[in-house]
């Protein structure tokens, strides 16, 4: 069921790209975002992990001054507590952002697949990551809730903050 949902979400993004026949990438409409995240595990993940740190990598295309889409990836490392091992999530997702103004509030989210590392008998599952934050030309600071609905009824959830720097294409 999760894989079917993922396919539906990916196909829903395809009409946006199909309608743009003369897409031109410029420093004003496309860039890379690279940054760090820090969070606290919630739900079942809080039983086996005390906190997490991660990398956030994104490629963004701005359709107009308010709407952006792109590809998101990175790595979230969960530090095990007590006798539990560390583990991680590597997302591969599409993302959407709505910017209210050129500098200020934004909201958005990622939807894709989260690959799990160092967890036996579980490859991963549906990955969602809604966000709300502040942005300017160079920086994004945001709060997020991240959930990977993995196989065998394992949900890996955390809440946290992140910061990314915009690397413009020239």
Give, region by region, the residue ranges found by the protein language model:
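Outer-membrane beta-barrel "beta-signal"
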Residues: 33, 37, 106, 136-138, ...
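Bacterial Sec-dependent N-terminal signal peptides
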Residues: 1-24
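Strand-connecting loop/turn motifs
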Residues: 27-31, 62-66, 100-104, 134-139, ...
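Transmembrane beta-barrel domains of outer membrane proteins
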Residues: 58-60, 97-99, 131-135, 164-166
């Amino acid at each position: 069921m999760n894989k079917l949902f993922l396919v539906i979400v990916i196909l829903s993004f395809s009409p946006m790209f199909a309608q743009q026949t003369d897409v031109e990438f410029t420093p004003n409409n496309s860039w890379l975002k690279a940054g760090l995240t820090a969070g606290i595990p919630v739900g079942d993940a809080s039983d086996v992990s005390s906190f997490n740190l991660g990398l956030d990598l994104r490629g963004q295309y701005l359709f107009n001054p308010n709407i952006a889409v792109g590809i998101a990836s990175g790595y979230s490392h969960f530090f095990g507590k007590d006798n539990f091992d560390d583990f991680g999530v590597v997302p591969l997702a599409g993302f959407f952002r709505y910017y209210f103004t050129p500098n200020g509030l934004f909201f958005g989210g990622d939807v894709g697949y989260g690959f799990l590392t160092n967890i036996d008998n579980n490859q991963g599952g549906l990955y969602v990551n809604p966000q709300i934050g502040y942005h300017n030309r160079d920086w994004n600071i945001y709060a997020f809730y991240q959930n990977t609905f993995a196989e065998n009824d394992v949900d890996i959830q955390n809440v946290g903050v992140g910061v990314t720097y915009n690397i413009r294409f020239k």
